[in-house]
Amino acid sequence: MNIAVVGLSHKTAPVEIREKLSIPEPQTESAIAQLTSYPHIDEVAILSTCNRLEIYIVAGETDHGIREVTQFLSEHSKLPVHSLRQHLFVLLHEDAVMHIMRVAAGLDSLVLGEGQILAQVKNTHKLGQQYNGIKTILNRLFKQALTAGKRVRTETSIGTGAVSISSAAVELAQIKAENLAACRVTILGAGKMSRLLVQHLVSKGATQISIVNRSRERAQELAKQFSEHPIRTHLLPEMMTVIAESHLVFTSTSATEPILDRAKLEMVLAPNQPLMLFDISVPRNVHTDVNELVNVQAFNVDDLKAVVAQNYESRRKMAQEAERLLEEEIEAFDIWWRSLETVSTISSLRSKIETIREQELEKALSRLGSEFGDKHQEVIEALTRGIVNKILHDPMVQLRAQQDVEARRRCMQTLQMLFNLDVGEQFS
C-alpha cells in the first residue's frame, strides 16, 4: 500500500480552474463514495478550500489509483484529462506525508502561516471518517498532521499576527478605497470568512457595514459578535438594493454559481456609479463580465497575491523553525508506518506457529489418554504457549526495530520464504 495525493492549488492553477474542481461539503459524501468504488483505491480524503483541491488516497497499485483519481477529477470538472494534467500535482508516500504536514501548518498557504487551514484539515478528517473514506492509514496520517499543525501554532511564532485571506482582502480594499471609514460596505454571506471580514474591517475603521445572508438568524448572530458596531443585516431578496447603495462589496458565500453579474448590476447601478467587488469565494460569486461596466472593479482571491507578498519575507524566516518541528512529526509517522509494514508478516508467522502448536498438542493429549487430567492439560497448554512466545519474541522485536527499509523488507521476505507464509497484499 502507498499514500498518494493528487491535487491542484493557487500555485498550479488559476481561480477559474480551481472553481471547476471545487467539491463543496454537501458533495463530499458522494465524491468519497465514487472514489472508493474504484478498484484500486482503499482509502480517500478530500481537502477542498478556496485555494486548493487535494485528494489523498491509499492504493495498492499507486499508478492505477492516481489514474482513477485523475479520471474522477476530469468527470467532476468536465475538463478533459489532457487539459487538467497541466494543473495537477502528484506526490507519493514520503512527499505526500510531508505535504499534508506543511498544509496543516499553513506553510503551503497563499497567506503563509494562516490558521484557518488547520480547521479545514480537521474537517476533512472528520468527513472522511463519517463517510467511510478514511481508515487506518489516513486516520493516522491526518491525526499526525493535525498534531503538527497545532504544534506549529503554539510552539512557533509564525501564527503571531498572521494574516488570512479575509484580512488580505480588507488590506487590498483599503489600498484601493483609501478611506474605509467613509465607505458603505456590504458583505454577502455570514460564515467564518465573513466573520473575519467584519473583524478586519472594523479594525481598519469601517463604520458602515451591512451583512446580506439567506438566513437572517445567521446574519444577526454574526452582527451580535460585534455589538459595539452598528452592523445592519438583510435577507438575500434585498441584496441588489443594498449593493446599489454600497461602495465596497465582499462576497463569501457557498454558492456554486455566480450570484452577481453584469446584468444584475446594470439594473441597480446608476450610470458610471463606482463599485468595487472583492470576491474571496471559490467557486467565484462574481462573474467576470462585471468588469465590462464602467467604474466597476472586481477582484478575486488570485488578486490578493501582491498584498500577501508584502509580508512574505519576514514570515518565511518564521517558517524555517516550523519546518524543523514538522520533521519530528514526519518521523513519528514514519516509525508507525514502518511498524505497520511488518504486521501482516508477524501476524501470519504467529498464526502458522499457533496452528502447529495446537495440532501437535492435540496429538500429544490424545496419546496420553483420558486419564490425563484437565489440570495437567492446562499446564502443558501454558508450557507450549510459553515456548512459542519465547521463540517468536526476539525475531518480532528485531523486525519492528529495523530502521533500514530495504533491510527490513529483506528480513520479511526471508521469513515468508522460510516459513512458506501467505501474507496477502504487502505494504510497499
Swiss-Prot record:
Which residues are recorded as binding substrate?
T49, C50, N51, R52, S109, E114, G115, Q116, Q120
Q: What is its EC number?
A: 1.2.1.70
Query: What are the protein's UniProt keywords?
Result: Chlorophyll biosynthesis, NADP, Oxidoreductase, Porphyrin biosynthesis
Species of the source: Nostoc sp. (strain PCC 7120 / SAG 25.82 / UTEX 2576)
Q: What class of enzyme is it?
A: oxidoreductase
Q: Name one GO molecular function term.
A: glutamyl-tRNA reductase activity
User: Which InterPro entries would you find in this protein's record?
Assistant: 4pyrrol_synth_GluRdtase, 4pyrrol_synth_GluRdtase_dimer, 4pyrrol_synth_GluRdtase_N, GluRdtase_CS, GluRdtase_dimer_dom_sf, GluRdtase_N_sf, NAD(P)-bd_dom_sf, Shikm_DH/Glu-tRNA_Rdtase
Residues forming the catalytic site? C50
Query: Which Pfam family would be a valid example here?
Result: GlutR_N
More about this protein = During catalysis, the active site Cys acts as a nucleophile attacking the alpha-carbonyl group of tRNA-bound glutamate with the formation of a thioester intermediate between enzyme and glutamate, and the concomitant release of tRNA(Glu). The thioester intermediate is finally reduced by direct hydride transfer from NADPH, to form the product GSA.
Provide the catalytic activity annotation: (S)-4-amino-5-oxopentanoate + tRNA(Glu) + NADP(+) = L-glutamyl-tRNA(Glu) + NADPH + H(+)
Its protein name is Glutamyl-tRNA reductase
Highest taxon in the source lineage? Bacteria
